[in-house]
Amino acid sequence: GSMDVLCMDKTGTLTNESILLEYYMDVLGNESTRVLDFAFLNSMYHSGVCNPIDNAILACQTMPGRSAYYTRLLAQYQKTDEIPFDYARKFVSTLVTEADGAGQLIIKGDIAHVVARCGFVEYRDAILPMDEDKMRSVASVVDEMLQDGMKVIAVARKRIEKQNRILPEDEQSMILMGYLAFFDAPKKTA
């Protein structure tokens, strides 16, 4: 389920010029606004270069009736730290803190690189250890979306108590939450 090269049509010659967020789902493939919320916080609070994937995620705040919800979500979580995206790691990490000082480390990016840092998986509101069966389930859901021409990224989290800096060592034993799937539709004339 990993991708080494993502080709995007920046000129709009072959595609409709914008990547759209098609699905936000848990590890079983069910729609999950919780996965979208954590991806939104990661996209909003990282300071890296603006990119089409983050733009598609951030556009969720313009969905009908969702603007006030995302305003409240941003008020609930404040950015504390980040480790920017780089092409070796293939994901971005942000640490957000709630009013009580407890934090959530959120990573978002390449499926293989994110899953490699996960020791747990979130299944139906339960946190379970990642094992071979769960890895096969993850691969099955992701492979189906990739075969449909989607770009798929993973979202994972980990609760961090009262810490205001994150280090690469913190990006272990993460909890895989789910996926985001994007589509850049080809033009009918392409």
How should these model regions be labeled?
Residues G1-A190:
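Conserved cytosolic headpiece of P-type ATPases
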